[in-house]
Structures are given as structure tokens and as C-alpha cells.
A protein has these predicted regions:
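Periplasmic-binding protein-like
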Residues: 63-76, 95-97, 137-138, 188-204, ...
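Extracellular/periplasmic periplasmic-binding protein-like sensory domains
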Residues: 208-279
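Extracytoplasmic "Venus flytrap"
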Residues: 4-25, 49, 271-277
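Segments of small-molecule ligand-sensing domains
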Residues: 265-277, 288-342
Length: 350
């Protein structure tokens, strides 16, 4: 059974390539050792989605029409998700593993990850309760996911009686942020909420710290993970927080088992583990579980059956012993140099 992994291998999101591909290889090795998917050995095909719809569709067409893959796991930005689903979703299963907006998706897309509202609400409640934060400035990239994250933030801040002090949407290119940083400094915000992708988050946070703002206000960042923090550097992560359903330092038996498999496979020089890679690992196991559930390895049949309303619940149930688990917890982590230390679960703040 040939499974494709479609994700950006360059550009702002390319920094996750090593961890995504390493985690996928661990998942495939684990499944093949247990008999593959219903007796069929799995082989992986890696494909570059690029960062625009044209490149993503060209890659998707090649995967299905030329490579003849039986399923596609997407770990790319959300603006590519619906076009890819529309192009291939009726022919092969399409599983999307990136954190996403929580909006209604195409019927042919099975999304497994947690959503922005699921993360933002407990995080904002915690920031309000524990840090007395009521004034927020938002910075995101200029495409679907950050704009929907900003919409969720505005709604949630309004519900808790807080205030949005300003916002900015940045292109996914390297840029100087002097004017924006002056706006943030003058805004009176307690917290800068970020929805920046990969290298964009690295660049912004380095400049934020260089301007001395890291000593004056908190930063709460979506999808700032172990990879991004390493890129930002130890001198620029003061007062930087993130929340996610997965951090490598979350101490659970499920995660300990995964980390053992991962480091046994790649040793001390393994790419850092992060949610991006773990999502793909779980996507592979979800596909295998649904193939068993529906008693089929036929791509079109699986794609049709996975459109059912119970597929996501069945997939997450099958992941009960995997790192994130059946019912994802939401963890808060604080940067300590170039690591993220999990401080607590914040589900209770929902």
C-alpha cells in the first residue's frame, strides 16, 4: 500500500520537514512490523506541497495519477487543504493532520488535529486568571489560518471581557518589523498572540526580543513548537508561551513509548520531536485503523466510507494509545532557552 506524505519541504514551513518525515518513517516501520495495513506492506512517498495552490495541486495530481498512491496525508498550510481535497478526495483517502481553524471542512477531508478555538479558549482563560491579561495584540501571516485564528481570538476575548489592542497580518517572506514593533510597544497590550508559520515566527520573535519587548510583555504563540523555539534561540525566548495538544516533554506513558520508538530509530541525532511530526505519525495509524474498521484497502472505497460523520471519532478512538490520545489534552508550555517546558494541562480552564 503506497501512502503519500504531502507537506512543504522548503519556504517558511520547510523547517518541519525533518521531524515530519522522521515521525512518518517510525509510523510506517511500526505498522509494517505488525503486518502492514490488512496484510499489505506500506511504502511512503514524500511530496512537496509548496506554499501555493498551483504547486500543491500539481503535486497531488502527480501522486495520484503517476505515482498511483492509495492515500494522501496532508501536513501543509490550510489554504491548500480544500483545493487538494477537491482534486483528489473522491479518489483516495485524504487525511489532514495540521492544527486547523475548526471550521467546516470538505466531506472528503478527515481532519485529526485539535483546532484553534480548542487551544485558544483555555489559554486565554489561563492568561486572564493567572497573569491578569486583558489586552491582546495579534500578529499572524496573511492567509486563511491566521485570519480565522484572529476571528476566534476576537470572539473569545470579547466573551471574557478583554480588549484587542491591534492586529497585523504579514506576508510569508523575510521582512523587517520595526514599524510593527513600535505599534505593539505603544499599544498597551499585555500579551502578543501569534499565528505565524515556521521561519516567520522565528524572524518575528528574534526582532521582538532585539527591540526589548520580551522584557515588557508576554508572547503567546500558536504552533510555536520545539523546532521553532530552537530557531528563535535562547536569547530571544523570554516570556514566550505556547499551547498545544502535544509537546515532547508531556510526560505520559503513551508519549514515552513513542519517544522510545523514535529515538531507537534515529539515535541521539534525531530531529527534535514536535506536534507536526506526531500528527503525521498518528495520521498513518488512523488510516490503518479505518481500513481495518471498514474492511477495505481499496482507495475509492476507503475515501467514500471515510466521509461518514463518525470517521473522526472512530479514528481518534483508535489512537487511544498513541502520543496525543483519544481525547487530546491541551498543554501550556513556557520557553526555557531553546526548550519548551510543559507547565500544566489547561483543559480545566475551558
Amino acid at each position: 500500500m503506497k501512502i503519500a506524505l504531502l507537506h512543504p519541504r522548503a519556504g517558511a514551513a520547510g523547517i518541519w520537514t525533518p521531524t515530519i518525515e522522521a515521525a512518518a518513517m517510525v509510523g510506517v516501520a511500526e505498522l509494517n512490523a505488525a503486518g502492514g495495513i490488512r496484510g499489505e506492506e506500506i511504502s511512503l512517498v514524500f511530496a512537496d506541497s509548496g506554499m501555493n495552490v498551483r504547486d500543491a495541486l500539481a503535486a497531488a495530481d502527480s501522486l495520484v495519477d503517476i505515482e498511483g498512491v492509495d492515500a494522501v496525508i496532508g501536513a501543509h498550510t490550510s489554504d491548500l487543504r480544500d483545493p487538494v481535497s477537491d482534486r483528489i478526495g473522491s479518489r483516495v483517502p485524504f487525511i489532514y493532520t495540521s492544527q486547523y481553524e475548526g471550521i467546516a471542512l470538505r466531506p472528503d477531508t478527515l481532519a485529526l488535529s485539535t483546532t484553534d478555538p480548542e487551544i485558544l479558549w483555555p489559554a486565554l482563560q489561563w492568561l486572564s486568571s493567572e497573569r491578569r491579561a486583558q489586552r491582546f495584540f495579534f500578529v499572524g501571516n496573511s492567509y486563511l489560518w491566521p485570519r480565522m485564528a484572529y476571528s476566534s481570538l476576537r470572539s473569545l476575548v470579547r466573551r471574557q471581557g478583554g480588549e484587542i489592542c491591534g492586529s497585523a497580518f504579514l506576508p510569508m517572506i523575510e521582512a523587517e518589523h520595526h514599524d510593527l514593533l513600535r505599534r505593539i510597544a505603544a499599544s498597551g497590550a499585555n500579551v502578543v498572540v501569534q499565528a505565524l508559520v515556521g521561519q516567520c515566527a522565528i524572524d518575528f520573535n528574534r526582532q521582538f526580543a532585539a527591540a526589548g519587548l520580551d522584557q515588557k510583555m508576554l508572547r503567546f504563540a500558536l504552533i510555536v513548537d520545539e523546532i521553532v523555539v530552537c530557531g528563535i534561540g535562547a536569547d530571544a525566548t523570554t516570556n514566550l508561551m505556547s499551547a498545544s495538544s502535544y509537546f515532547a516533554k508531556a510526560r505520559t506513558r503513551r508519549n514515552d513509548r513513542f519517544l522510545e520508538l523514535y529515538h531507537d530509530a534515529f539515535g541521539e541525532f534525531a530531529p527534535p520531536v514536535s506536534a507536526a511530526g506526531v500528527g503525521v505519525y498518528e495520521g498513518l495509524h488512523a488510516l490503518a485503523a479505518l481500513a481495518r474498521e471498514y474492511e477495505s484497502n481499496t482507495p475509492a472505497t476507503l475515501a467514500r466510507l471515510m466521509r461518514g460523520p463518525d470517521s473522526r471519532r472512530a479514528a481518534r478512538h483508535a489512537l487511544a494509545n498513541k502520543p496525543i490520545g483519544e481525547v487530546p489534552a491541551i498543554y501550556l508550555a513556557e520557553a526555557d532557552g531553546v526548550t519548551l517546558e510543559v507547565t500544566q494541562e489547561i483543559n480545566s480552564y475551558r
